[in-house]
Amino acid sequence: MMNIDDTTSPMAHPIGPSQPPSDQTKQDPPSLPQEAASSVSADKKDLALLEEKPKQSQEEDRVDTGRERLKKHRREIAGRVWIPEIWGQEELLKDWIDCSTFDTCLVPAGISSARTALVEEARRAASASGGLHNRCLILR
């Protein structure tokens, strides 16, 4: 009795009456006519294609990470996007970048004057004592 085991391959496996059907890893070479042999080779090609599909899906899964998708997108889009030199709203950008009006409000003037006062006080104390040793500490 001949049976085709769909789980392993489309090739024919002999199954005896005392032998239950099972997954057989050993395959007998086909003794089929020329037409059947060509269909078997076509089936082998189909199996090879099916084996390649999981490999391709694994590559697609690897590409699905955010960083890989961004790299792929940059490669695909490079050269197709036109970036204009002038877009007509540069004045608004310059106004937004200029933060001098905020800087005066955020940095109090008293900080710089307090630092200056401390430096002057240290210089007066050093000159009053007349020691060269104290001057070296101030200049550091």
Swiss-Prot record:
Residues 1-10 have a biased composition (Polar residues). GO terms for cellular component: nucleus. Its main location: nucleus. It is found in: Nucleus. Keywords: Nucleus. GO terms for biological process: blue light signaling pathway. Residues 42-68 have a biased composition (Basic and acidic residues). It comes from the Eukaryota. CDD domains: BIC1_CID (cd22645). Regulates the blue-light dependent dimerization of CRY2 and formation of photobodies. Interacts with photoexited CRY2 to inhibit its activity. Inhibits CRY phosphorylation. Interacts with CRY2 in both darkness and light. Disruption phenotype: No visible phenotype. Bic1 and bic2 double mutants have a blue light-hypersensitive short-hypocotyl phenotype and an increased anthocyanin accumulation when grown in continuous blue light. Residues 1-71 are annotated as: Disordered. This is Protein BIC1. InterPro entries: BIC. The gene is BIC1.
